[in-house]
Amino acid sequence: MTVDARGHRCPVPSLRLRKALEGRAPGVQLTLLATDAMARIDVPFLMRELGGRVVQIDETDGVLSITVETGDALTD
């Protein structure tokens, strides 16, 4: 699944990602697309808070592609 938050400033990308992660089983991967550079900081913080992890961060033509994986805390 891809969460497209291009054109939005933080905290919107993190909020959209959080909503998309709710109720997902552990080990599920999602990718966030964002153009706000703060997502590079906010998303890893969010994933630590939720018990998940950042798998990969790439940037192409000003678009961040951040792949995350759910952890156990998201199903509680």
Where on the chain are the PLM-derived regions?
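Generic N-terminal amphipathic, Lys/Arg-enriched alpha-helix
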Residues: 1-3
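Amphipathic, hydrophobic secondary-structure cores in small proteins
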Residues: 5-57
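C-terminal structural segments of small proteins and small subunits
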Residues: 44-76
